[in-house]
Amino acid sequence: MGSTTDKIKGNANEAIGKAKQGIGEATGSDRLKGEGVVQEVKGKGQQAMGDAKDAAKEAIDRAAAAARRAAE
C-alpha cells in the first residue's frame, strides 16, 4: 500500500472511529464507544505508516542524489 493510500484510509478510519465514539456516547453504548476508540487508533497508525513511508522514500532519494554527486 502506498503512503497516500495509508494516509487516506487512516483519515477515514480515524473519522469513523470518532463518529462511533460520539454515537456510542449519545446512545450509552459502551461497545460502540470501544469500537470507535479501536478504529480511531487504527487510523492514526495507518497515517503514521504513511508518514514513515514518505520519510523513508525521501531519505533514499537524498542518499541516491548524494551518491550520484559523489560519483561525478
Curated annotation (Swiss-Prot):
Residues 1-55 are annotated as: Disordered. SUPFAM superfamilies: Hypothetical protein YjbJ (SSF69047). Transmembrane segments: none annotated. Signal peptide: none annotated. Residues 35-47 have a biased composition (Low complexity). InterPro entries: CsbD, YjbJ_sf. Belongs to the UPF0337 (CsbD) family. This is UPF0337 protein bsl2407. It comes from Bradyrhizobium diazoefficiens (strain JCM 10833 / BCRC 13528 / IAM 13628 / NBRC 14792 / USDA 110).
